């Protein structure tokens, strides 16, 4: 009788251990699957500089929808670009202003951007578009390309500059969709956790 009780306790103990092992095994596989999905669909980058101020600040951590699933940029999208001919391919963050086939012109005297001869309403910009960086306007966006500008038009290096110019879609790393961790403007402002959320 005593030996039967001992055997039952051993079996029950082993069942409990087996359950824990199976649970940890399943949890590990689930975490690996989630990591794989994350790596396929998303990327995380850090904003460097003030060209998107005040929409995005220096040091902001952004979640990107990767270019594997982000195929068709649209006006207003905030995208991350790696252009090998500019700053050794370091990622830069800009806003899509026009897509292939659209005509872009800029009235630098009044700071107004036109797409297909229609003035853009740009509530997101920090300053008017008065800085002429050398690109000739008007221009038509080439096939499989986009035209981008930074929201902080007074300091941004973007498609106005011939060094950057129009962006080939293959140079897009992804679309910024979520602000994960807020940075500061010039390192002198406290983090504003209220900025965490969907990027517009």
Please state what every model-predicted region is.
Residues 114-117:
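Short strand-turn-strand beta-turns centered on an Asx-Gly dipeptide
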Residues 134-174, 179-182:
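Soluble extracytoplasmic domains of inner/organellar membrane proteins
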Residues 94-105:
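RNA pseudouridine synthases
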Residues 1-91, 169-200:
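Protein maturation boundaries and topogenic segments
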Residues 67, 84, 109, 151-152:
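Short, surface-exposed secondary-structure boundary micro-motifs
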Residues 60, 74-78, 102, 145, ...:
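Structural motif
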Residues 51-55, 67-72, 95, 111, ...:
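Short, surface-exposed secondary-structure edge patches
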């Amino acid at each position: 009788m005593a030996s039967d009780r001992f055997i039952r306790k051993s079996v029950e103990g082993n069942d409990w251990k087996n359950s824990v092992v199976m649970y940890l095994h399943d949890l590990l596989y689930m975490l690996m699957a989630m990591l794989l999905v994350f790596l396929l669909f998303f990327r995380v980058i850090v904003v460097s500089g003030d060209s998107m101020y005040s929409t995005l600040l220096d040091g902001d951590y952004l979640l990107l929808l990767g270019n594997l699933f982000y195929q068709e940029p649209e006006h207003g999208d905030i995208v991350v670009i790696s252009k090998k001919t500019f700053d050794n391919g370091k990622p830069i963050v800009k806003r899509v202003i026009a897509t292939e086939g659209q005509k872009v012109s800029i009235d630098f005297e009044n700071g107004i951007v036109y797409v297909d001869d229609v003035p853009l309403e740009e509530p997101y910009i920090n300053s008017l578009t008065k800085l002429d960086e050398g690109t000739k306007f008007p221009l038509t966006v080439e096939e499989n390309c986009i035209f981008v500008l930074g929201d902080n038009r007074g300091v941004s290096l973007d498609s106005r500059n011939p060094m950057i110019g129009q962006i080939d879609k293959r140079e897009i790393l992804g679309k910024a969709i979520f602000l994960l961790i807020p940075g500061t403007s010039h390192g002198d402002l406290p983090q504003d956790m209220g900025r965490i959320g969907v990027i517009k």
